[in-house]
Amino acid sequence: MRYLCRAQLLSLLLLPLLKARLSVPAHPIPQSFLPLMISTWNYTDANREAWTVLRQGPRRTRQAVIQGCLHCQNSNSCGRLLGGHSAPDSSGGITLEAALIDGANMDYGAVAGMAGIRNAIGVAHDVLRYTNHSLLVGEAAARFAEAMGHKKEVHSLSTTLDVLLPWLLGKCQPNFWRNVRPLANDSCGTFSPLPQEQQQREMRQEYPIEPGHHDQVGFLALDTEGHLHAASLSSGARFRIPGRVGDAAVPGAGIYADNQVGGALATGDGDVLMRFLPALLAVEALRAGQSPASAAEAVMRRLLRHHTEFNGGLVVVSRLGVYSAACAGLDEFQFVVSGESSGRSMRRVEGIKCLDRHEVVTGGPRGNFYVVSKKIWAAGGEDVLVQRVEKITLNEGVDSREFEEEYLEDKDAEIDVDEGEKAEEVRSLLDESPGDLLLHQLGLAPPFPFRFPFIYF
């Protein structure tokens, strides 16, 4: 009877979900292929930088993942959002977050919501080395960074404004508000809560991930002695509500590693990732005896059961170097793998096709979610701004898709045409007094003080 109870418990832990082609086949890596460096998305230059450090010898895993993050935060080779200061929050603030975990003892250091300090991964490393804490946030994190010798940097607002102004002129779409008034899908605020009786059934909002426009990257290093480190770096979701902390800084959400079993990197919609801690779940699935392929698939299905709108990917690596991945909501999820065989470095970009998530969601929640609207100019004739919204309804297992087209008024189109002129006006004012600026005086923002932090990097 005792044996049966244990078997039943184990079966519950390892119960596979419905079969689907969510993951790439597991790649068994011979010991001679180690060390191993894996990074999310197709940023080969950053992976190469990390790999150069890792192959210098054993016990270089920590320095390797840090070097990968440093390359991304100091260059534009990991996309505009990470290196180009193009992911402001809704108030125009630029902040970074980063995290580092040691698989030997689960030591963890992270920062979030930190403005004015470029070297976010370096500050996260200092949190791990010099404090008993795991996560520091906001202005206090910046003060800690300065105390550790990191310098604040001033950055021009030009790049930020290039992203922020079109968003403001487009009625702040998309944003992260719900159940507020005025309606969040047609306004910039200021918002206040809707009375409970007026709140509608929750609509899931999808946030597509554009190729090359990723706001988070993760690195995982495994050496020949079995040491694991993982690190993550993020500029945060564009137009997020100020004060929001993302998955890159939360233990188990974006990264996790344990020398005894393996590690994982997760990326995608951070607010969903933080609710499920997929990197931690994947590592615990390895501990329970699952393969990297089945672990990645099971975790991805768990997310999709509750969040049909999820976009993102997950890479899982065993302590022996076997790796696999799963993804949802993307045309393709790519990650870079570097290793060594017979003294020669080998690097490849893995790309997996994601299953249509509507085929996966058979027992999950029902309801509606909307693809973020895209604004395009009609070709030929008079310029008319067209807003196309794809509405997908899941009811009783039957999918239906509706397309709605809304032709905006001419005055909205005229505002868009004048955008460049307004932007020049803003920049000229910034050149004269690069401190606080109230954009609403120019008619470019909602009727509340719009404040740019003075310190940018």
UniProtKB/Swiss-Prot annotation:
Keywords attached to this Swiss-Prot or TrEMBL record, sorted alphabetically, are: Disulfide bond, Signal
Q: Could you tell me which SUPFAM superfamilies the record lists for this protein?
A: N-terminal nucleophile aminohydrolases (Ntn hydrolases)
Name one cellular component (GO) term: lysosome
Single GO molecular function:
N4-(beta-N-acetylglucosaminyl)-L-asparaginase activity
Q: Where is the signal peptide?
A: 1-20
User: Record's Pfam families?
Assistant: Asparaginase_2 (PF01112)
Which pairs of positions does the record mark as disulfide bonds?
Answer: 72-78, 172-188, 327-354
Q: Name the CDD domains for this protein.
A: Glycosylasparaginase (cd04513)
Q: What does the sequence similarity comment in the record state about its family?
A: Belongs to the Ntn-hydrolase family.
Q: Which PANTHER family match?
A: L-ASPARAGINASE, N(4)-(BETA-N-ACETYLGLUCOSAMINYL)-L-ASPARAGINASE
Record-given protein name: L-asparaginase-like protein GL17509
Query: What organism does this protein naturally occur in?
Result: Drosophila persimilis (Fruit fly)
